[in-house]
């Protein structure tokens, strides 16, 4: 039998993860753009991720432009590069907090979880598929590592690029991204 005290937490985690995986499908873009292949990029922008800062702090692109972001984590902590508006970041921060509280997100990376301890029936589920950080507008970068995100911006708007790992956005790890017409 599934312990009663674990049921509410498990249902919340499953709801967040199923919702996130539906939104994370590569076929799904955002209102402001969509993922692209690096070969389609008209230019590359290097972004340094430090402990609680981005360099540069502001980026300008043009509507219709495809940009390859080359991300270098020079900090000692795991960081995220996520494109979106303030409301999107606030929502994603809730998901990241769930991941941290579940033990999946550590200060320096993603941990694997032993779901066999979660109760009857849970061990047979494909948790590896469910618990992923794979939104197309976001990438996690471990300390000392590099990653890339290529994006086509489809309309003029004001966005942010941010790290939504719990506490990082609040500590100032957010930059302005302006999409010019």
Curated annotation (Swiss-Prot):
<feature type="binding site">
    <location>
        <position position="168"/>
    </location>
    <ligand>
        <name>Cu(2+)</name>
    </ligand>
</feature>
<dbReference type="GO" id="GO:0005886">
    <property type="term" value="C:plasma membrane"/>
</dbReference>
<dbReference type="GO" id="GO:0042597">
    <property type="term" value="C:periplasmic space"/>
</dbReference>
<feature type="binding site">
    <location>
        <position position="79"/>
    </location>
    <ligand>
        <name>Cu(2+)</name>
    </ligand>
</feature>
<comment type="function">
    <text>Involved in copper tolerance.</text>
</comment>
<dbReference type="InterPro" id="IPR000923">
    <property type="entry name" value="BlueCu_1"/>
</dbReference>
<keyword id="KW-0186">Copper</keyword>
<dbReference type="InterPro" id="IPR050845">
    <property type="entry name" value="Cu-binding_ET"/>
</dbReference>
<feature type="binding site">
    <location>
        <position position="173"/>
    </location>
    <ligand>
        <name>Cu(2+)</name>
    </ligand>
</feature>
<dbReference type="InterPro" id="IPR008972">
    <property type="entry name" value="Cupredoxin"/>
</dbReference>
<keyword id="KW-0574">Periplasm</keyword>
<dbReference type="Pfam" id="PF00127">
    <property type="entry name" value="Copper-bind"/>
</dbReference>
<feature type="binding site">
    <location>
        <position position="163"/>
    </location>
    <ligand>
        <name>Cu(2+)</name>
    </ligand>
</feature>
<dbReference type="GO" id="GO:0009055">
    <property type="term" value="F:electron transfer activity"/>
</dbReference>
<keyword id="KW-0732">Signal</keyword>
<keyword id="KW-0479">Metal-binding</keyword>
<comment type="similarity">
    <text>Belongs to the CopI family.</text>
</comment>
<protein>
    <recommendedName>
        <fullName>Copper-resistant cuproprotein CopI</fullName>
    </recommendedName>
</protein>
<feature type="signal peptide">
    <location>
        <begin position="1"/>
        <end position="24"/>
    </location>
</feature>
<dbReference type="GO" id="GO:0005507">
    <property type="term" value="F:copper ion binding"/>
</dbReference>
């Amino acid at each position: 039998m599934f312990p009663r005290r674990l049921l509410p937490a498990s249902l919340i985690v499953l709801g967040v993860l199923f919702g996130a995986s539906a939104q994370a499908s590569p076929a799904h873009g955002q209102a402001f753009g969509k993922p692209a292949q690096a070969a389609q990029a008209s230019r590359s922008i290097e972004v340094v991720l430090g402990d609680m800062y981005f360099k540069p702090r502001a980026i300008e692109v043009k509507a219709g432009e495809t940009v390859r972001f080359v991300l270098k984590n020079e900090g000692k902590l795991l960081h995220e590069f996520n494109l979106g508006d303030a409301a999107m970041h606030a929502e994603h921060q809730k998901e990241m907090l769930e991941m941290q509280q579940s033990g999946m997100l550590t200060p320096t990376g993603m941990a694997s979880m032993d779901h066999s301890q979660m109760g009857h029936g849970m061990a047979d589920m494909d948790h590896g598929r469910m618990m992923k950080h794979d939104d197309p507008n976001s990438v996690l970068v471990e300390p000392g590592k590099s990653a890339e995100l290529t994006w086509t911006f489809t309309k003029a708007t004001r966005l942010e690029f941010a790290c939504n790992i719990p506490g990082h956005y609040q500590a100032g790890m957010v930059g302005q991204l302006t999409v010019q017409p």
